[in-house]
Structure formats: structure tokens, C-alpha cells
Curated annotation (Swiss-Prot):
The keyword Secreted applies. GO terms for biological process: defense response to bacterium; killing of cells of another organism. This is Brevinin-2Eb. Shows antibacterial activity against representative Gram-negative and Gram-positive bacterial species, and hemolytic activity. Keywords: Amphibian defense peptide, Antibiotic, Antimicrobial, Cytolysis, Disulfide bond, Hemolysis, Secreted. The keyword Secreted applies. Belongs to the frog skin active peptide (FSAP) family. Brevinin subfamily. Disulfide bonds join 27-33. The lineage of its organism: Eukaryota, Metazoa, Chordata, Craniata, Vertebrata. One of its GO terms (cellular component) is extracellular region. It comes from the Eukaryota. Expressed by the skin glands. It is found in: Secreted.
């Protein structure tokens, strides 16, 4: 249903945001930005 679709979208968006934050943090820590 629509609710399940929205939940999946939120999960996917959350994962993407987390991955982006981790990438940014590790690149800043290693000085390879």
C-alpha cells in the first residue's frame, strides 16, 4: 500500500543520508576531500 511505499522511501532516504555523512566524515578525517 501507500504507507508501505512511504516507509520504504523513508528507509532508503535515511540510508542514503547516513552513507553521505559517513563518506563526508571519513574524507575530512583522512584529508582527501
Amino acid at each position: 500500500g501507500i504507507l508501505d511505499t512511504l516507509k520504504n522511501l523513508a528507509k532508503t532516504a535515511g540510508k542514503g543520508a547516513l552513507q553521505g555523512l559517513v563518506k563526508m566524515a571519513s574524507c575530512k578525517l583522512s584529508g582527501q576531500c
